[in-house]
Amino acid sequence: MNGDLEVDMSRGDFNPSFFLGKLKDDEFESRSLSDDSFDAMSGDEDKQEQRPKKKKRKTKYHRHTSYQIQELESFFKECPHPNEKQRLELGKKLTLESKQIKFWFQNRRTQMKTQLERHENVILKQENEKLRLENSFLKESMRGSLCIDCGGAVIPGEVSFEQHQLRIENAKLKEELDRICALANRFIGGSISLEQPSNGGIGSQHLPIGHCVSGGTSLMFMDLAMEAMDELLKLAELETSLWSSKSEKGSMNHFPGSRETGLVLINSLALVETLMDTNKWAEMFECIVAVASTLEVISNGSDGSRNGSILLMQAEFQVMSPLVPIKQKKFLRYCKQHGDGLWAVVDVSYDINRGNENLKSYGGSKMFPSGCIIQDIGNGCSKVTWIEHSEYEESHTHSLYQPLLSSSVGLGATKWLATLQRQCESFTMLLSSEDHTGLSHAGTKSILKLAQRMKLNFYSGITASCIHKWEKLLAENVGQDTRILTRKSLEPSGIVLSAATSLWLPVTQQRLFEFLCDGKCRNQWDILSNGASMENTLLVPKGQQEGSCVSLLRAAGNDQNESSMLILQETWNDVSGALVVYAPVDIPSMNTVMSGGDSAYVALLPSGFSILPDGSSSSSDQFDTDGGLVNQESKGCLLTVGFQILVNSLPTAKLNVESVETVNNLIACTIHKIRAALRIPA
């Protein structure tokens, strides 16, 4: 019987952490009736012993057959915690009662825990013996130390003081070791491992930490990360709404929370690697993440994977409008594998338990447990459940955008998941063997890289992120909702002026997007068209949805030799919003780019539009018979208009008032033309 129950601790693949988390709930549930015959008892004796000894009845002992023990052991390896249905099925198979099955598994887990605790005690005893020997060596060394000047003992008299100090230090080390061992019971599958000591005994558990974060702080971060992971898993399993969209009474702080689930064209390992690599993460979510960096690696993943990895990160999160401040956050990111093809990545502010001083600063916010759960479903696809929950000062946001940020579309789960789906679809299309452009692979890659730089420059001019060193200008005759920025530029060389404003329009996002992308309607609002309609000379599709592409435009009906200018444009449209960004480029430069040349030397001054839902919860859109207008009671969309112009070719030149008035008039004129074309009253 004992031979069936012994665990070979000398095996190299023995993993005690597998059992530590599984055995927590069994600590007071059951005890073994006997070390030699725990699997031979039905469990009736435990109940009999707890009753008052008024009547003595002969206890029946039931010894399981070898076949029963073999089947129970086999099932235990697969599932140490069978549910009632599994116990009934197993009992029916082995002709045992469900209660007998239950007690057998309880006793089996209890004995496994006892064996594991015994080996933990061996580890601690070895560590204690090692510390004791080191202390003895230091004691002997100090006892024989002599002063260089006087030749006397360094510590006069008895060495009791030195012994006392060593005991204090030993106690501190022992306490720290106990804390790490306790943490190991929770940190299953992380970077804590059994390290083989120099004396050849069983290793002690250690924790690799960053160089800039102290050991105590790292343990605190790990505790916080694991609590956040538990909270994320609970939120993902809830079937009801997670949070109320309203602020607490009497508080200016807002607590938006959202959850969204969808399919993504990427496998779990690739997505986990993207999320845990700061540069890849910022590139994937470029319209949300302005800048990001990893401050410290708190814990590396185990076995060369990202499982158990904890990062201390900081990032700036943006909404495409000058009326919404950039949200700056410092947070922990923890990645954990919960099964084959099942991962979870959680973010949480590292100062979540502190006060709200950070919220008082402009753009300050706090991140509650947020992140995603990723599950492989085959064919290179994953099912992703995204959860977002944060806190910010509502008074810092313009009233026009407060409903949007309170919904899941502003910076909520819908925005993150839709962006992930769009980007993964784009990467999948670009990696496919089908050629829709007639360009070489190098040419396509070069033009897409140029379009990406154009987008990032446009985002920076709208949100004033730190990608470029923008300086804010306060000018007269400029509306309060219009932001004027300036910066020195190297390509093109000179002073660049950026102007952006946002407004609400009573048209649907789809209607406005189609109008702005229609080349035949371009002359109704774009001064670069010179009154002519525009046509595509090149189109690189980036998604299945119509309008998601990078294109080259030129005036229709004109010979290519008549004009040396083309317009590079990128557009996309999904449930989270839409984008139309463009920039004039010269033909020789684009010929070089389309041939696979370096696009970094092409000068760009992007302009364009960002379209966002207005965050209203009204019913379906209402169209009129002539052009897509909706009633004021129905939801419209939020339009952000942004222009960048070169006002002086000398980087050292001073900005004049006329330049500011020019770009301000350009924005006002463009908005007026769009309103007129869509028959929207001013």
UniProtKB/Swiss-Prot annotation:
It comes from Arabidopsis thaliana (Mouse-ear cress). It comes from the Eukaryota. Disulfide bonds: none annotated. Belongs to the HD-ZIP homeobox family. Class IV subfamily. Keywords: Coiled coil, DNA-binding, Homeobox, Nucleus, Transcription, Transcription regulation. The keyword Translocase does not apply. PROSITE patterns: HOMEOBOX_2 (PS50071), START (PS50848). Residues 214-429 form the START domain. Gene3D superfamilies: 3.30.530.20, Homeodomain-like. Residues 52-65 have a biased composition (Basic residues). This is Homeobox-leucine zipper protein HDG7. Residues 33-65 are annotated as: Disordered. One of its GO terms (cellular component) is nucleus. InterPro entries: GLABRA2/ANL2/PDF2/ATML1-like, HD, Homeodomain-like_sf, START-like_dom_sf, START_lipid-bd_dom.
